Amino acid sequence: MLDFLPVDSPSNVNRCAPHLSSLCPSSVKDRAPHLSVVAPLKCQYRRALIPRLVHIICGKLA
């Protein structure tokens, strides 16, 4: 099982995955922050993955 980290603020969910913010009302996020942490983690992973792929692809072409 993954260990979930606390979310800084609900705006992280809105910024990373606006389609998920409507599924989880703020009252639910306050009582169960682990429900809203999935979107920011995926977003951070995607942000880290894209530059790495670009670096790998560009490194092979150079």
UniProtKB/Swiss-Prot annotation:
It comes from the Bacteria. Keywords: Plasmid. This is Uncharacterized 6.8 kDa protein in replication origin region. It comes from Escherichia coli.
